[in-house]
């Protein structure tokens, strides 16, 4: 809200004075003596106009000098313009939050553009790992923020239920089933050894007895495929419910083969002369588009590669009417991006349609030590285990608060701590404190009138808190532009910090001064609205008592 207001005022000045339009930053400066907000617009314009940036800054300041939004405007260094905002402008932020309530922060940036976020997608061959958890929360927060900014968002999970990994899963489950019946069967090379398959096998023994003991054929393979897929997918959906995540669409890879989409896309590529046959296989001419080797689409045995079905899947996304799609992948899949871009180009799909957001890996830490082994799965820590230990709120907040491009160390002890050192506790406690203020006011007989006596707000802590309330929409835009949920958690930490400072330094509920109490309760109420809204976008609760 505040950034938009300043940017609009400055843009009008430079358009009138120079006939120019230029992108520039408006942000909170590093030190309070540099004002409430600062801009680099003069330095940006200097390059275009070939003019001294301080001279440009002076001309901008002169044009804005009489504006009641500012107490004063100063020029610093090579040409930074520092704005000291008026109390009137800051109080207007509180008034706006109180009027708009849960609508505050919403803006129609996307204008209804149809976009898709695909994330959490995994081979349904085992439980979600903590790495999947990080991806799910990144996707959830981005989806929520994009909706808040006026986009028509679909959340989708791609189920890799075709291909050799599903056959290996079936063989692994069959081996576990036979082992429980006393028949020694080896898990195939590259198969799945997690204890979760023993649990499924145990259920099967109870349900069907020894019907498929030491028996393997096409019918048995199909039975074990479907059983493993159904049980694991059901378990994955249980985990999604536990973490508070849901998808609009669960899309089956197998369906692309069954409905003819894969063959349709292969035919399109052949007609565009971008495929060829070699060694009995069908290859895509990736090298015609980028400096990379050609890739196999259809193996010599007639089966499709993952690359082929993935191309078909994204072609179908385009045909479903999405203007842009955002796939969220682990950073180990970065090599798949250029060849997918090449495939989209080969199909004449616009360059900006297919987008990938990469995230780094997660390491768990407990008692200062790295957690290396899971008790259940034998080789990885499951998302379920993490949720059981630290709970939904801490899991979601902690995954959101680290830049996706940064390797994450998830501190289990910190996530469980009921102290102000725990970031999610710190923010939630601010919300609980606000609720307690109103209970306290009622007990002390201080009558609350919403929106009244705001003219009494204006000390340093109140100003900082009001300014931070006015930065909410800017934080949401940064999340969307940078694909960085941590921009929202950073904002909430800053807002909570400014509220705790205000709460600690000032008497908010004072029966001897009801009008000032009312003004400060209004500021607290506005803060609570924004804290609750921000936490909701992350999927975290805003408790009234702690």
From Swiss-Prot:
Family: Belongs to the class-I aminoacyl-tRNA synthetase family.
Keyword tags: Aminoacyl-tRNA synthetase, ATP-binding, Cytoplasm, Ligase, Nucleotide-binding, Protein biosynthesis
Protein name: Arginine--tRNA ligase
Subcellular location: Cytoplasm
Entry keyword Ligase: yes
EC number in record: 6.1.1.19
Residue ranges of the motif 'HIGH' region: 122-132
PROSITE patterns xref list: AA_TRNA_LIGASE_I
Gene: argS
Pfam family, one: tRNA-synt_1d
Catalytic activities: tRNA(Arg) + L-arginine + ATP = L-arginyl-tRNA(Arg) + AMP + diphosphate
GO biological process per UniProt: arginyl-tRNA aminoacylation
């Amino acid at each position: 809200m505040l950034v938009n207001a300043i940017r609009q005022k400055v843009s009008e000045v430079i358009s009138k004075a120079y006939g120019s339009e230029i992108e520039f930053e408006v942000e909170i400066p590093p030190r309070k003596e540099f004002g409430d907000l600062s801009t680099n617009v003069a330095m940006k314009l200097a390059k275009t106009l070939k003019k001294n940036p301080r001279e440009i800054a002076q001309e901008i300041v002169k044009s804005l000098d009489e504006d009641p939004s500012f107490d004063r405007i100063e020029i610093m260094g090579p040409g930074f313009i520092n704005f000291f905002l008026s109390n009137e402008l800051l109080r207007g932020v509180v008034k706006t939050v109180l009027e708009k309530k849960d609508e505050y922060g919403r803006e129609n940036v996307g204008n209804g553009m149809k976009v898709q976020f695909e994330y959490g997608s995994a081979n349904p061959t085992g439980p979600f790992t903590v790495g999947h958890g990080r991806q799910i929360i990144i996707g959830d927060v981005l989806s929520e923020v994009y909706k808040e900014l006026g986009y028509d968002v679909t959340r989708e999970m791609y189920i890799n239920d075709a291909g050799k990994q599903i056959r290996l899963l079936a063989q692994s489950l069959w081996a576990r089933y036979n082992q429980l019946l006393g028949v020694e069967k080896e898990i195939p090379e590259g198969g799945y050894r997690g204890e979760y398959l023993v649990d499924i096998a145990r259920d099967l023994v109870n349900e069907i007895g020894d019907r498929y003991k030491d028996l393997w054929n096409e019918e048995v393979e199909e039975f074990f495929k479907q059983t493993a897929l159904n049980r694991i997918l059901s378990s994955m959906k249980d985990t999604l419910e536990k973490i508070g995540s849901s998808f609009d669409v669960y899309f089956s890879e197998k369906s692309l083969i069954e409905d003819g989409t894969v063959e349709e896309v292969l035919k399109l590529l052949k007609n565009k002369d971008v495929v060829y046959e070699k060694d009995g296989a069908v290859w895509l001419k990736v090298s015609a588009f980028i400096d990379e080797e050609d890739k196999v689409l259809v193996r010599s045995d007639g089966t499709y590669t993952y690359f082929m079905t993935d191309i078909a899947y994204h072609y179908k996304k385009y045909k479903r009417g999405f203007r842009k799609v955002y796939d969220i992948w682990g950073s180990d899949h970065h090599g798949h991006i250029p060849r997918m871009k090449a495939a989209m180009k080969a199909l004449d799909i616009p360059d900006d349609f297919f987008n990938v957001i990469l995230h780094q890996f997660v390491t768990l830490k407990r008692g200062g030590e790295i957690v290396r082994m899971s008790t259940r799965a034998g080789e990885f820590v499951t998302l379920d285990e993490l949720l059981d230990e630290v709970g939904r709120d801490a899991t979601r907040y902690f995954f959101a608060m680290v830049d996706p491009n940064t390797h994450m160390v998830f501190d289990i002890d910190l996530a469980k701590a009921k102290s102000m050192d725990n970031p999610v506790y710190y923010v939630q406690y601010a919300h609980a404190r606000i609720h307690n203020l109103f209970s306290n006011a009622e007990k002390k007989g201080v009558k609350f009138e919403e929106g009244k006596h705001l003219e009494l707000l204006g000390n340093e802590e109140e100003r900082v808190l009001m300014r931070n309330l006015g930065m909410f929409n800017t934080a949401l835009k940064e999340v969307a532009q940078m694909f960085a949920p941590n921009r929202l958690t950073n904002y909430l930490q800053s807002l909570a910090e400014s509220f705790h400072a205000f709460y600690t330094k000032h008497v908010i509920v004072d029966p001897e001064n009801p009008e000032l109490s009312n003004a400060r309760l209004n500021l607290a109420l506005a803060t609570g609205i924004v804290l609750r809204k921000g936490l909701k976008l992350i999927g975290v609760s805003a408790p009234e008592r702690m």
